[in-house]
Structures are given as structure tokens and as C-alpha cells.
């Protein structure tokens, strides 16, 4: 069975901006993307993709043993919600698995789990929204995780070869 997820990411948060904004929203945010410099790293940017199944995602980031504490400085945080269906635990797990399995080849990912792709057809569509303006982010910094993550990620069975293939579309363009 095929699964389709539309993810709406809000971002370019700094940690101190996130909680107040999140409280003011009606949506439940289940996923997050973090980029920054790891302790003792001068230039290299590292990334972390995670899930939170709490009322407030920002509470998860405040956990004492969370990976956010591995960063000496945070470049950005994006928080995401699945907008085309009520996200159940298995949906959040599947989306996190797709994101980490794609991104592990792209950058310095701190995640140590979920590096293998799922065994079903999955379609992910990512929308990037500027949290202050509530409008689409048309330009992001080159090293932004929102710029590195494709807008569309498709993982599906190639029936001719009888194996799964990964398809991506980096940035969708508006047509006139």
C-alpha cells in the first residue's frame, strides 16, 4: 500500500524563539531538523533529524540527554507537521525513517538509527514556511537543512527490476 505525506516545515528558528511560537500555534509538531556545529568542531556543520510525540516539541529539545546538547552552536531549527492526515505513531516513525535514510548520504548526520529505507512505496512532499511571515521560504541559505532536503522524496518499487528506487526533486519551481 502506498503512503503519501505532506510535511509543512516552519523555520529558521533559534532555540530561544521556538517555544513561545509553538505555544501560539494550533498544530501539533512531530518532527524537527537541527543544524549546527558540534562541540570541538570549528567549521563542519552537523545535522540531526528527530521526532517528538509530546504536546510541545520544544519540551523534547529540553531533555537533558537530547542530541541538541551535542551542538556548541545551533544554526537553525525547523519543526514539522504532517498536514494531510492525523499523524499516528507509525506515520511519524515512517517519515523520520525516510528523512534520515535519505539525508545520511547528504551530510554529517548525528542520527545513529533509521538509516535503512522502508519496504513500501512512500511519497514525501516538503513545504518550507517562514515562521514569522507564515509564507513560503523561496530562498534559504546554501547550508540550510531546508535547502539541502529535497521538496519531494519518493521511494517506490520498480516492478521491472523488482527492487526499490529512490527519486528526489530538489526544489520545485513556480510556473507562470
Locations of regions flagged by a protein language model:
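Boundary/linker segments flanking structured domains
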Residues: 1-47, 51-176
Amino acid at each position: 500500500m502506498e503512503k503519501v505525506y505532506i510535511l509543512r516545515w516552519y523555520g529558521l528558528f533559534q532555540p530561544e524563539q521556538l517555544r513561545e511560537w509553538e505555544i501560539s500555534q494550533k498544530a501539533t509538531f512531530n518532527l524537527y531538523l537541527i543544524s549546527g556545529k558540534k562541540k570541538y568542531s570549528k567549521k563542519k556543520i552537523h545535522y540531526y533529524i528527530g521526532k517528538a510525540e509530546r504536546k510541545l516539541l520544544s519540551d523534547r529539545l529540553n531533555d537533558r540527554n537530547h542530541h541538541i546538547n551535542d551542538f556548541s552552536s545551533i544554526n537553525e531549527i525547523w519543526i514539522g507537521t504532517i498536514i494531510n492526515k492525523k499523524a499516528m505513531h507509525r506515520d511519524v516513525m515512517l517519515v523520520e525513517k525516510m528523512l534520515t535514510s535519505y539525508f545520511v548520504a547528504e551530510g554529517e548526520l548525528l542520527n545513529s538509527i533509521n538509516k535503512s529505507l522502508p519496504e513500501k512505496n512512500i511519497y514525501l512532499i516538503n513545504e518550507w514556511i517562514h515562521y514569522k511571515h507564515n509564507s513560503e521560504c523561496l530562498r534559504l541559505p546554501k547550508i540550510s537543512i531546508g535547502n539541502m532536503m529535497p521538496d519531494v522524496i519518493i521511494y517506490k518499487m520498480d516492478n521491472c527490476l523488482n527492487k526499490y528506487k529512490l527519486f528526489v526533486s530538489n526544489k520545485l519551481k513556480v510556473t507562470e
